[in-house]
Amino acid sequence: MGAREMPNDVQATIASLMQRIDELESRANLRDLVSDYCIGFDTHDWDRFISIWHRDAIWEIGPPFGSFEGHEGIRKAVFEVLYPVWRETHHLTTNLRLTFTDPNRAHGTCNVDCMGATKDNVVQMISATYTDDFERSEKVWKIAKRSVVIHYFNSIPGAQMTPPSSS
């Protein structure tokens, strides 16, 4: 029995299942984008980091950093604003909530805690919320816009970021 010969309820069930599978796969892809942001930035893996953004994406980091547009703006943010300040960073995202507005657009919100050390060895703790607009183009999900709201950005006096000693 071909697709044209299937009863309408079977066709509707298959269409519904295909839509649900697509959403599950999309959710996994979007979680990977959020993780690749952290991994790419923290490990200085530029190719991984830039691959998550649409060419004309907007990255609103907010004060004290600013807003940046497109791959060139994002490159400027990373290499001229952020990396020159930070010796190392460790981003941890959690509580990712995704809402699909249509099959090719989604909205996401997650929290991030980032511990980092500046080039002058001051350990900082940052807590923020990322709000993302994701878009799928040519079957690939990417970030179209990320807005950052920083809740706190504090130094931790006396803290050091050193690996454990091997004894």
State each model region's role.
Residues 2-39, 43, 47, 51:
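Short, low-complexity N-terminal intrinsically disordered segments enriched in polar/charged residues
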Residues 39, 64, 124:
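Short, charged/polar micro-motifs that form catalytic or ligand-binding hotspots
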Residues 25, 66-69, 122:
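A structural signal for alpha-helical segments
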Residues 46-112:
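A solvent-exposed, acidic/Ser-Thr-rich amphipathic alpha-helical stretch
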Residues 2-18, 82-167:
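A beta-strand edge to alpha-helix "cap/lid" segment located at domain peripheries
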Residues 37, 57-58, 152:
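Short secondary-structure capping/turn micro-motifs that flank functional sites
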Residues 32, 69, 129:
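Short, well-structured alpha-helical interface segments that form or flank functional binding sites
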